[in-house]
Amino acid sequence: MRISSYFLYVTLFFLLLLPLGKAVAGWNSFIVNFDKSLYGKGAQTWKIAPYDDHWVYFANKNGMVQFDGNVWTVFPMNNFSDVRSVLASTTQKRIYAGGINEFGYYEPSEDGELVYHCMSDTLERDCRFVGNVWGIHEADNILYIQGDDRVVKYLNGKYTAIEMNAKIDCSNMVNGILYIGTDHGVWVLVGNTFFPLQGADILASNRIRGIIPHKGGGVIVVTAYNGLFYCNGRTTVPFVTGAEDFMCENEVFCVAAQDDKIALGTIHKGLLLIDCSTMDVKYFNENNGLRNNTVLSVAFDSRGNLWAGLDSGVDYVSLSSSFTNLYSYP
């Protein structure tokens, strides 16, 4: 039977000590470890998309994975490639997924089962080789599919491939504008043309890992080794958190933001959680409950709790729970 909220699931989980995972301490926040064997042994999870308080979708090595709070279900793509990205669209009532040279969407049939519809099969052959689809975004009835060196735009049944003369490492839709992070800095898409983000020249030599909105306008750009930067379209300045040395030493790989909180996943030392209202910093790693120190994806759910896709397995950090641990791991 589907559980209607993650909070209820996690609470029961802790109280009943279900054998599917284990709850351990992490700075007074419970962490639930989900082993990869629960969803077909696909190790890496590259993207996470919570949806409507009831489900979470994962871009996993084995396919698109659905979790309803109780049951894990794997949906492979037509070419059985790793799934790199997933987008839960509340407007279209679809789950978009991108793999390697393939993208499409899952939609409920009349009996409620998800059915896959491949979109990339309808592309002209020379546009079909998008490589790894690391990002899928939507705005103003336009769907954007980000590949290794191009973005495919889908509007009114028509595809437009927009090539970028650089490797695209990440992308995000912020206030209706598509930003991309490349090995040539940060760019924005205007119409069907990429333009460099004004005032952000100093980022051209950085490895860009993510771009998130800043509550005062502009964006925060996340780099792999050199911390965070605030860009307003005119100037770019460091966004100082006090965790710059940690980021430099452990290589930031992914980011998620919600309200005043920023979650950063690292390659070597787990999760970093920053509260921008107080600049308090918390760390979650193998020493205090995280299953694995290599974090490939992060996402907040609607309750403010945090999902982390690891190099092996998935973890759930219950940040909003009133339950706390009496003990911590060394």
Regions picked out by a protein language model, each given a short descriptive name:
Residues 1-330:
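Carboxylate-rich, polar loop motifs that coordinate divalent cations or form catalytic acidic clusters
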